[in-house]
């Protein structure tokens, strides 16, 4: 009864009103697995290709009818008749048929939606929660609840304001359950709104639900968050730590890091690494993502040498969830953590390869959403099923973000999986 009898895809809308792809995998038993592909705003140049139609007469060129057709024809023909329990074989068939380095033939949005839908169908067929099915794929026996990396203040490509650093986040590390950590994060989020209002600042939110006020500097963004933490009654540096996503590739021009929001200040690689080290010394920052440009491996090496034993240095655009590129980072001792975005690589199997390669080499793993999301909450199950340790899924508003948090609450209720808090981090354990 595990045989795949039909695969269907459709064009749906994501949280930014852009088309994305949703796939159904239907089994002989009647079980249906369904999943959606997310979409990024700031993207690494080596990400797997998200196939868009380019037809300006539909959705301003962002339609995904070609990717949908690839599912309904090529992928349908490839996988119908196969056992849904053979996740690796299903994914490898799509990879081989595509035959390109970046899945440009089928589209990573097409392959990912089908890959995840197959996992949903297999879990349902076995009457298992998805997180348990994912755990079983790689023999993961210990399940943990992830520390949420909550993006409560936005800049850069995620907001229309004057702040250069893309995300200012909080991580509630000093709690004993995910539910308590989530509550603390929500309380700080609401406190931040009141802090911004008192200062006459904009409380509109960006793509990921974080506030996007016009602040004078990156440090001012940190300061208002610290005020919100204090106002809520929590202690920054013990209850709650800060995290940054610089998305530095967005302001790296001609070998210089240029902060336009701060009067076009210009930095060399080492100078910008030193600037970040100064922020870490001054503020309770435990994690920095994409501190330098994805091509600046020399700069990354320097950044790792000065901060790698103190805080988490996360590669997103740097590693693009690609095991081959991650292996280079491991070999060259660049970064100490990887952001996992499954649409950067295009299948569940390759995503798991990246996660377990990182874990085997002492790198921490952060499961992440994209700025263009849907109600699909698969990443919550992925975070628990791989004991990844951390999840990054936006702010404490917008149902496309909150759906993941709510799924984690349900999972915690089911499993009693441990919330490790500070123990997940380099520099805190």
Curated annotation (Swiss-Prot):
Chemical reaction(s) catalysed: (2R)-2-phosphoglycerate = phosphoenolpyruvate + H2O
Catalytic machinery residues: 208 (proton donor), 341 (proton acceptor)
Domain of life: Bacteria
GO CC terms in record: cell surface; extracellular region; phosphopyruvate hydratase complex
GO molecular function, one term: magnesium ion binding
Keyword Secreted tagged: yes
Cofactor: Mg(2+)
Keywords: Cytoplasm, Glycolysis, Lyase, Magnesium, Metal-binding, Secreted
EC number assigned by the record: 4.2.1.11
Cell compartment(s), UniProt: Cytoplasm; Secreted; Cell surface
Cofactor binding annotation: Binds a second Mg(2+) ion via substrate during catalysis.
Pfam family, one: Enolase_C
Binding site for (2R)-2-phosphoglycerate: 166, 341, 370-371, 392
GO biological process, one term: glycolytic process
Subunit details: Component of the RNA degradosome, a multiprotein complex involved in RNA processing and mRNA degradation.
PANTHER family cross-referenced by the UniProt entry: ENOLASE
General function of this protein: Catalyzes the reversible conversion of 2-phosphoglycerate (2-PG) into phosphoenolpyruvate (PEP). It is essential for the degradation of carbohydrates via glycolysis.
Family to which the UniProt record says this protein belongs: Belongs to the enolase family.
Protein name: Enolase
Gene behind this protein: eno
